[in-house]
Amino acid sequence: MKKTIYVDYRLLNSNSDDCLENNLNDLLASGVDEILVKPVFMSEGYEVKKLRERLEVFKTCFSKIEFDTPVLGSSDSMNFFADLLISEIGFSSEYEYLLVGHGLSGSSNIEYSKLSDLLHSKGILNVEVACLTGEGDIASYLEKVQKKFQESGKKTIQIYPLLIKLGTHITKDIFSTEEDDEKSVLQLLQENGFSVIKNIVPLSSFESFKARYMNDSKNFSS
């Protein structure tokens, strides 16, 4: 029996159900009868739900269509991810750190809040997690970090994106320096007097992240 790990953005890149059907027919023609979907998103948001709905139509064509848990979708996965961030980033005591996720509009973004609390519980107190949209946004972060800077005397914030792929959310929404109607995270921090170190790296640039969340099927049932 042949299994395929199918990273979901490859399916979502098909903008119509006809294109999606063609992709799935190609898989069937190549002998695939099980599709294992690894969500390339941090939480079970709109994109994952959309893909689930689209694939539901084709479930009778395959013996199994199974979804792995998103990065922040379980306590075990979140704990692994927090340890991964500590190992990859290091969190030097010289700086404050801001991790920026996408978030969901109209959402409490509870997964990101839990990640922040988990990092603090592991002794990493100089880090906060914020989102581009929904609760826990950059405006809320600015209020919090200004107080922290007064207490710590630190001058510089290092920004890391909590986004898996390098795209416009990273290059524009977080790090853009161009004049636009909506200011980037970088611009908002600089306008509020903070010195910023940019780390323009998606999570997929970390080998440990790819090994755990993108390249293997160990989290799927047999």
Please provide the spans of the model-predicted regions:
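Active-site-proximal alpha-helix that buttresses catalytic centers in soluble enzyme cores
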Residues: M1-S222
